[in-house]
Amino acid sequence: MKGSRKVYLLFFWLFSVSAMAQINTDRMMLMGRNALYYEDYVLSIRRFNMVISAKPYLSEPYFYRGLAKFYLEDYTGAEEDCGAAIDRNPFLPDNYRLRGLCRINLKRYEEAVSDYVKLLEIEPKDESGWHNMTLCYLQLKEYDKAVECIDRMLGYWPQKAPLYTLKAQAYFAQKDTAAAMASIDRALEINP
């Protein structure tokens, strides 16, 4: 009887410790996000490291740690964390958006384009995704693809004057002055 009582006590003690671990990782996530909000990026990275060591299968702490690293301009580390988050959950668009930004800062535009393509598969009307992909194509001097992206954006947001000026920039780079001037005229019609 005494031995079974010890087994029950041990069972309840282990159960309560594992329940506290659950509460602590949730709390660490909250503390890490709060530190991120208050721009204490080093502290937030520490908090997310604790969550990752306790629950490495979650994607969220990798994303937030990557976001903190991005703000600290550790683009390589942020890209790796976004990749780890994508490995764990490939259906969250923020992971692709952040990894694309990291790759732009690392001047790896082709890889950034592939991230934005995946982002736009998940969220087809993501304005920042379309815009950043267009900028990548401009950096790669693939002006036809940039114009194609801008035309898609204009299909979603036809009254955005900056899109026409961006289109004019692509046309000027192609030395198509007439098309560039037509785009600028359209931008001025929308926003004089």
Where does each model-flagged region fall?
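N-terminal leader/linker segments that initiate helical-solenoid repeat arrays
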Residues: 19-64, 71
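Register position in tetratricopeptide repeats
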Residues: 37-38, 71, 105, 139-140, ...
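Helix-start (N-cap) detector for alpha-helical repeat units in TPR-like alpha-solenoids
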Residues: 24-26, 59-60, 93-94, 127-128, ...
